[in-house]
Amino acid sequence: MTQLAIGEATPHGATYDGHGVNFTLFSAHAERVELCVFDSRGNERRYDLPGRRGDVWHGYLAGARPGLRYGYRVHGPWQPAQGHRFNPAKLLLDPYARRVEGELKDHPLLHGGHDEPDYRDNAAVAPKSVVISDHYDWEDDAAPRTPWGKTVIYEAHVKGLTYLHPELPQEIRGTYKALGHPVMVAYFKQLGITALELLPVAQFASEPRLQRMGLTNYWGYNPMAMFALHPAWASSPETALDEFRDAVKALHRAGIEVILDIVLNHSAELDLDGPTFSLRGIDNRSYYWIRDDGDYHNWTGCGNTLNLSHPGVVEYACECLRYWVETCHVDGFRFDLASVMGRTPTFRQDAPLFAAIKACPVLSTVKLIAEPWDIGEGGYQVGNFPPPFAEWNDHFRDAARRFWLPRNLTTGEFACRFAASSDVFKRNGRAPGASVNLLTAHDGFTLRDCVCFNQKHNEANGEENRDGTNSNYSDNHGKEGLGGPLDLMERRRDSIHALLATLLLSQGTPMLLAGDEHGHSQHGNNNAYCQDNALTWLDWQQANRGLTTFTAALIRLRQQIPALTGNSWWEEGDGNVRWLNKNAQPLSADEWQNGPKLMQILLSDRFLIAINATLEVTDIVLPEGEWRAVPPFAGEDNPVITAVWQGPAHGLCVFQRG
């Protein structure tokens, strides 16, 4: 058998140098590692990796070229009680693979064994890693680096955003190419968003359970290869990387940042009954959190949890993030179930991964947004992430809904959430931008469904409506479903307007769910992770143009208010904010805690937000001076000048001092 040269322990993965390929694989507990390469007919040839430096195995294959398909067979103990599940009968993906050929099918040969090893060879059905050679001309690309105070995030799904867009060439709808097409760039600019946050684009798999039901994982939170782009949204697997980078480059030229939703908390290997295709077979004990009985700690709800306190896994995570920043020029990340990142196993602000990110000159300067919880004990960590992390603020989401979709909520609680939840985020030197305010996200009701449904309707997901949260704080305004008489539809419209204004005129970083500005509905499905169909795709031809115009005007208004764009905490008497009652007097202690939902918020001494969240029309006396209503609450050419606002029920209006 041809021997490999020893090669080098870095860089990680498979690296082509023009003459051959250097291969590396981290495994602290392996006893032997075989590199397996495949020709065009699927014939396999195996080579032992001859070198080992620390826990990294390595070797160099002279003459190997880009396009080579490969995998690993890793030898070591089968000791499930100790967390070791080595099985060389199973071909394994390189965790650093930049491209993957094949899908992760629901196939018995991909199972590595539960109590006993499954020694059936899986090479015929296993996905293969592919060597790539990377050259790309970024031209004069530069990161927009939008300040947090001016950032407006737009959360979208690559396919769902553009798949039904009639103005895009049909062949690129639902693809990476579409994201950077002039039609989409113009739309983003017209809307006024500054950052496009994409649901996972790293290659993912559909869970076996979904495959058996004829469904697919649509959202992408089931990662298979963290360094490889999901190929389904490209012209071909070979062109995916360049097509994605073309989109990033086009968005950057328009001043729009690109943020990736990334899943560094579990893998698609799932629980012990899931497929063995990579990490489990490479070094189960190092990559995952293992219980005393050898099973997984399931702090993610997905069957396994990555051990991001292990030095080798910390390095893997940081290399992954650096790859997306340096190779694809992305501007930041939103971390799914991010409390896992801080587990040691208890959550710590000085956890190894946090420390590594903070110390990295590449990663510490991009936008980092945590989903600050997981489902394990002590997993809810809102407000506890260290700088430079921002966090999703579920306090804001719930308070905004409870305020406008009648629930019990004090004026004081609403004001606190409006002021970037300083009680939660004003710590560790963080600024108001650390509070990422949202009304909705991919997970949950859309904004329109918040005003049309009291109950979730997830029957299409195949779990008899058991999945998805029951805590929606929604209000159907008297009739379940989308239709209804004119007065009901008007009340729903008013509620949507009030909610959007609250989101886009509050201190903190607003995040808008793609489609909410259209009136998109998922017909009450609040967990559409497996619905790759018209339920989730945005229907641009049915979009509510008036609502889109309203949303864009709110974003423009936001950018005019220094109190919102300055990204500094409001202090008493600093001119940023005054809290007034319906008579333009400072709110009393009783009004803060027990008063009706009537208030005025004066921002930067020039912009006044008048709020009537009661069920009755109420006169609100504006502060002394001349006030004119501003778009989208009045026309540019015909501003309404008034001293008293007759506030409609569930109404909100913004005025500017003349």
UniProtKB/Swiss-Prot annotation:
Gene Ontology BP terms: glycogen catabolic process
Pathway in which this enzyme or protein is active: Glycan degradation; glycogen degradation
SUPFAM superfamilies in alphabetical order: (Trans)glycosidases, E set domains
GO MF annotations, alphabetized: glycogen debranching enzyme activity; hydrolase activity, hydrolyzing O-glycosyl compounds
Residues that span the membrane, as ranges: none
Keywords per UniProt: Carbohydrate metabolism, Glycogen metabolism, Glycosidase, Hydrolase
Record: active site: D336, E371
EC number: 3.2.1.196
Hydrolase keyword on record: yes
Taxonomy, superkingdom: Bacteria
Catalytic activity line of the entry: Hydrolysis of (1->6)-alpha-D-glucosidic linkages to branches with degrees of polymerization of three or four glucose residues in limit dextrin
Site (Transition state stabilizer): D443
Region annotation (Disordered) ranges: 459-484
Database matches in InterPro entries: GlgX_C, GlgX_Isoamylase_N_E_set, Glyco_hydro_13_cat_dom, Glyco_hydro_13_N, Glyco_hydro_b, Glycogen_debranch_bac, Glycogen_debranch_GlgX, Glycoside_hydrolase_SF
The protein's enzyme class: hydrolase
Keyword Metal-binding (UniProt): no
Pfam families: Alpha-amylase (PF00128), CBM_48 (PF02922), GlgX_C (PF18390)
Entry's family note: Belongs to the glycosyl hydrolase 13 family.
Function: Removes maltotriose and maltotetraose chains that are attached by 1,6-alpha-linkage to the limit dextrin main chain, generating a debranched limit dextrin.
Protein name in UniProt: Glycogen debranching enzyme
Source organism of the structure: Salmonella typhimurium (strain LT2 / SGSC1412 / ATCC 700720)
